[in-house]
């Protein structure tokens, strides 16, 4: 489609390419001078910046206390894992063990937890996501299957286990899933 426009005109059109997470090809084009770069370095009016913290496993109880405080304020929480099941080769937290740990710390009937991962049938994933969207659950334990197409303003906290196992683009894609709401 762009090629037709270029061939149709004697003066080449200006092309504006926008991305929040550049793919390697786009990044290479900017590095090697094939694209001019404009930077939007401020947030839209009224949007609070996303706060990022790093905690080691030794601070897990502090993280759980923070989660409980956020849930008391009516907020929802994402907890993202790099693996669904335990790996024989990698020493990482996995979703299934993480879910069990969270379920012990956040028991029914006071708390409800959804679980979503790529090995689930689409109907089961949709059901669990809808429970989270409808605020029937306060915590969504998931893999990066939530990376695309999930925008729940009430879910203002995201915990990413073993964040070093994710690529920078993946982390950048996940970040907006947890927006800071107006209450701070």
Question: Where do the language-model regions lie?
Answer:
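Inter-lobe coupling/hinge segments of SF2-like helicase ATPases
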Residues: 1-184
